[in-house]
């Protein structure tokens, strides 16, 4: 879908519907739900195009706007995807009414088994915990043999996505705010911010090598420094990066030239902290601690200049009486873009 406007929300997104699980990740108001609703046909963009596979289902200029029922997209959103007065089995049988009785019964039994719901077939939706209810909703949706599955619910978990991968080979677009679950369960990651697609690609590749500052911020690379490439050493596989307050040794930057302006990023959990009197090493920066925030398992340390580190509570207990601090930005943990 590209360049769509829905009410006051503007979407400038070119997002391919490809087989496998694509996670849509971004802050509230980024356009994740609006994207799915436009694809499904529940909202009508003022302009733009929507394609499902090779089929154009919406084109504002050409006057094409297929109704939702003809797009063959299964959409699971805030509304319950199950009939509350029916059991799980009855819900699936209702969705499978295109087949003859014996074939329908067989297909429903197979789908219940795939989603590990055989013990819940006579239960009603209200009697299921949220995550199992969502499994039943997905199973019912797949009985209609959709071309694509759109999931806009926060109850999706690793078990559901694993079962879904074995039950459906087509495109899945899944809205989530769980970055760890994206990493473990999605094939691709689409990063949305302000109605724009700011990053897209295989999950691990995009998490390790974000394409922009906006993408880096979304995937929790909180330490970001504008820098100038002051040197390139292919023999040592290194670069020299001049930031505003310090100079860093980074990875060799193939395709870049000396003098190029870049951004350097590092996750807070990859920053190491040392006592001020320790002999400095590579990428050690003397820093002043300005804020400490205790969390359930970690402590977040924020230093003058904006660098933040996330360390274990045990490590902080050993170092809390430091008279001075040095932060270490390991070269292997730096991301340059």
Where are these regions (language model features)?
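ABC-type ATPase nucleotide-binding domains, specifically the catalytic core motifs of the NBD
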Residues: 86, 90-106, 114
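Conserved ABC ATPase "signature" region
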Residues: 58, 103-120
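ABC ATPase NBD coupling module
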Residues: 57-74, 98, 206, 210
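Non-catalytic connector elements of ABC transporters
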Residues: 2-34, 38-51, 55-56, 232-337
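Hydrophobic anchor residue at the start of the ABC signature
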Residues: 138
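Internal alpha/beta loop-helix hairpins
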Residues: 176-246
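Conserved ABC ATPase signature
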Residues: 124-132
């Amino acid at each position: 879908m590209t360049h769509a406007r829905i009410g006051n929300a503007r979407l400038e997104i070119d997002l391919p519907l490809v087989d496998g699980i694509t996670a849509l990740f971004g802050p509230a108001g980024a356009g994740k739900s609006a994207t799915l609703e436009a694809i499904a046909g529940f909202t009508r963009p003022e302009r733009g195009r929507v394609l499902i596979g090779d089929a154009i289902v919406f084109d504002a200029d050409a006057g094409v706007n297929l109704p939702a029922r003809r797009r063959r997209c299964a959409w699971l959103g805030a509304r319950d995807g199950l009939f509350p007065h029916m059991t799980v089995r009855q819900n699936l049988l209702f969705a499978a009414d295109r087949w003859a009785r014996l074939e329908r019964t067989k297909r429903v039994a197979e789908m219940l088994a795939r989603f590990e719901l055989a013990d819940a077939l006579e239960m009603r939706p209200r009697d299921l915990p949220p995550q199992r209810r969502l499994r039943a909703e997905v199973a019912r949706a797949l009985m209609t043999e959709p071309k694509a599955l759109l999931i806009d619910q926060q109850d999706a978990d690793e078990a559901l996505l694993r079962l879904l991968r074995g039950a459906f080979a087509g495109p899945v677009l899944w809205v989530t705010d769980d970055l760890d679950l994206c990493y473990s369960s999605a094939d691709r990651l689409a990063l949305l911010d302000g109605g724009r697609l700011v990053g897209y690609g295989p999950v691990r590749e995009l998490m390790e090598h974000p394409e922009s500052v906006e993408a880096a911020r979304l995937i929790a690379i909180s330490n970001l420094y504008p820098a100038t490439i002051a040197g390139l050493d292919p023999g040592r596989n290194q670069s020299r990066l001049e930031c505003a307050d310090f100079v860093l040794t980074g990875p060799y930057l193939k395709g870049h030239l000396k003098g190029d302006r870049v951004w350097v990023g590092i996750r807070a959990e990859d920053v190491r902290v040392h006592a001020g009197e320790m002999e400095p090493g590579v990428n050690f920066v003397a820093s002043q601690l300005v804020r400490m925030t205790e969390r359930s398992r970690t402590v977040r340390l924020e230093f003058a200049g904006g660098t933040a580190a996330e360390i274990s509570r045990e490590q902080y207990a050993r170092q809390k009486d430091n008279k001075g601090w040095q932060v270490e930005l390991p070269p292997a943990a730096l991301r340059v873009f």
